[in-house]
């Protein structure tokens, strides 16, 4: 138990905010954080990441963005488009997490060719799209956010992306189990386990994006988390 606490992080360092559980939860979580991490209401300035790190209040972000809003939809669609453009123009970049090019990483992780990826991801993940055809059969492509998309966003904004998952120590069975988050509140005993740090070269230069990834209804789901003290959060989590 002591080792578990030492290797995990108190969730009270953050304010947790869920987004709707659709195919675009990754992009929606990023959209909410973009709005939080800039002081501007003008979406053009938000989309240019002006004054990144001069944060808005979480109350204001939750009021404007919440689980779903038109502003969120706008920003989520924008950031997905930026990712597609970056991938198209940097397909040979080496992804540190795989040691392979972005193109080959797409084949490994998404099981798509580059051309398929560019075509499918050109459709916003939040849009219902059941009319695509493969060998005369309808199918649906899950445009989920993987380490590829995390890496690209880190490059676009020039900031780290730090991803946690939620864990809980089960004292009855003396084992670690998945931790639940209900109504943006962690279940008693739930702590955050560092899962990935993307864009380590940007640590200390720009405010990171903080996310939680967890299983939800047997699928992956992203939540956004806002540091309660942005200026000290990295030292508090020992990064």
Region locations from a protein language model:
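Papain-like cysteine protease catalytic cores
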Residues: 2-15, 20-174
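Deubiquitinase catalytic domains
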Residues: 118-239
């Amino acid at each position: 138990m002591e080792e578990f606490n030492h290797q995990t992080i108190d969730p009270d360092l953050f304010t947790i905010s869920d987004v709707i559980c659709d195919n675009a939860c990754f992009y929606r979580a990023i959209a909410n954080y973009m709005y939080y991490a800039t002081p501007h209401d003008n979406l053009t300035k938000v989309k240019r990441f002006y004054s990144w790190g001069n944060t808005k209040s979480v109350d204001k972000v939750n009021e404007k963005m919440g689980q779903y809003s038109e502003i969120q939809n706008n920003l989520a669609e924008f950031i997905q488009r930026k990712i597609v453009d970056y991938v198209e123009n940097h397909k040979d970049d080496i992804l540190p997490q795989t040691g392979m090019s972005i193109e080959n990483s797409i084949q490994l992780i998404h099981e798509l060719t580059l051309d398929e990826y560019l075509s499918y991801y050109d459709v916003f993940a939040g849009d219902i799209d059941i009319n695509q055809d493969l060998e005369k059969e309808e199918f649906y492509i899950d445009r989920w956010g993987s380490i590829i998309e995390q890496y690209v966003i880190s490059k676009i904004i020039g900031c780290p992306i730090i991803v946690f998952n939620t864990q809980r120590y089960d004292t009855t069975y003396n084992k670690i189990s998945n931790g639940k988050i209900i109504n943006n509140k962690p279940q008693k005993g739930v702590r955050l386990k560092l899962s990935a740090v993307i864009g380590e070269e940007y640590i200390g230069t720009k405010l990171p994006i903080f996310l939680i990834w967890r299983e939800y209804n047997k699928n992956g789901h992203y939540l956004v988390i806002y540091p309660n003290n942005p200026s000290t959060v990295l030292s508090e989590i020992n990064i």
